[in-house]
Amino acid sequence: WDQQIENTAQPLERGSAAATLARLQADRLVTEVRVDAEAFDAGERSALTALVDDRLLTRRDDRVRFEHDLYGDWVRLRVLRSQAESGRLVEFLEGRMDSPVWYRAVRLYGLHLLEHDGLASWREAFAAFGDLGDAADLARDLLLEASAHTVGSARALSALWPVLVE
């Protein structure tokens, strides 16, 4: 993120353009998004050109996509972290859990919580996801899957055992 977004001439525009693209891909269940004034503002459209030049994105005609799916997942993780920081993660995910594209981002979010923020943060997210209605079980399952992929997964699973048997 630092190299491709933050340490550039247009960090805000590049970050916003990448986040908008990642969100639109997942929300619309598409791999490419048409670059137009409805989807991207003028600053974002300019930043998209720079992201294509830096090979983070690929352009075909009037559409853009991430060079690799992992870039999109990585940016969607950033979107989720931003929503969590503002206290709107559950609200943000409410209408989005029917899109499988968000699943990897939720799993990565769980992984991020376990590896960077600790078990308490993971437990808070797990509890908060209970408010997602019909999607609560799915969101919680994705967080649980993250625990199996973390460094020291046996230790993480042992620490999470009380939550798992509730």
How does the language model describe each region?
Residues 27-165:
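C-terminal leucine-rich, beta-strand-based interaction scaffolds used for sensing/assembly
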